[in-house]
Design a protein with these regions (language model features):
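Short helix-loop-beta junction
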Residues: 43-51, 137-141, 217-235
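Short, conserved beta-strand edge motifs with alternating hydrophobic and charged residues
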Residues: 172, 209-210, 233-236
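Glycine-/acidic-rich phosphate or pyrophosphate-binding loops and their flanking alpha/beta elements
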Residues: 10-17, 157-168, 177-228
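Thiamine diphosphate
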Residues: 1-172, 176-177
């Protein structure tokens, strides 16, 4: 691919790849074609793939999440979108008590391979109840994988890997990253369970460990420290 993509456009490319190649996949949630909710990350998906597969719902986080979790238990692939992860707390039961537990309760014979997209939607007119990043909470839940891509490439490729994983996955994207741009190679299918932290920069004085938007902030901090003669290692 010989053009640059924005972070949100890379997510859109991931959705297009998945919906084109996996006919049993559907997406459900609120504001799925509203730029105010999801930027350009889902632009025209309803026109390309139909509203039977791109299902925009009334406001009921528990209902649409429970539906997606249940569909995963009967072999379907589903993505449920929460435009503000703060309100995903209304869906704690299907995520934490059902999706995350199912494989362990039944000896690994069945699992809800639902992907839960949670958007960090802070800034602008957003209040404190709209601006949280709750990734560390969910990272403590056994059976639930948590993904927070910081790069354009990872935004696409880790979305695809999340949906193709056998486990329930919480995929978190930060809207403050949407303006980042980079080139995309052809899709390479990754196995989510094999992904490791990325060494972004080598350094000899201090190590900085970051994820998502904090990786971008860390790069800026490293440039300042570099001018002071401090060499930093950055792990994403």
């Amino acid at each position: 691919m010989n053009k640059k993509y924005r972070y949100d456009e890379a997510i859109l490319e991931g959705f297009k790849f998945l919906l084109s190649n996996y006919s049993d996949l559907f997406i459900i949630g609120q504001g799925l074609w509203s730029p105010w909710y999801v930027g350009n990350s889902m632009k025209d998906l309803d026109k390309l793939f139909g509203k039977e597969r791109i299902i925009d719902t009334p406001v009921s986080e528990a209902a649409c999440t429970g539906l997606a979790v249940g569909s995963g238990l009967v072999g379907m692939k589903s993505i449920v979108v929460h435009p503000r992860m703060d309100f995903m707390l209304y869906a704690i039961d299907p995520i934490v008590n059902q999706a995350a537990k199912w494989s362990h309760m039944f000896g690994g014979k069945n699992s809800s391979n639902v992907t839960i997209r949670a958007i960090i939607n802070r800034g602008g007119e957003q209040g404190a109840q709209h601006s949280q990043s709750l990734h560390s909470w969910f990272a403590h839940i056994p059976g639930l994988r948590v993904v927070m891509p910081s790069s354009v490439k990872d935004a696409r490729d880790l979305l695809i890997a999340s949906v193709l994983s056998d486990d329930p996955v919480l995929y978190i994207d930060d809207r403050w990253l949407y303006s980042q741009e980079d080139y995309l190679n052809e899709v390479e299918i990754l196995k989510l369970s094999e992904q490791k932290p990325n060494l972004i920069m080598k350094g000899s004085d201090i190590t900085i460990v970051a994820n998502s938007y904090s990786t971008l902030l860390s790069k800026k901090a490293i440039e300042i420290l570099k001018r002071k003669g401090i060499s930093c290692e950055l792990i994403d």
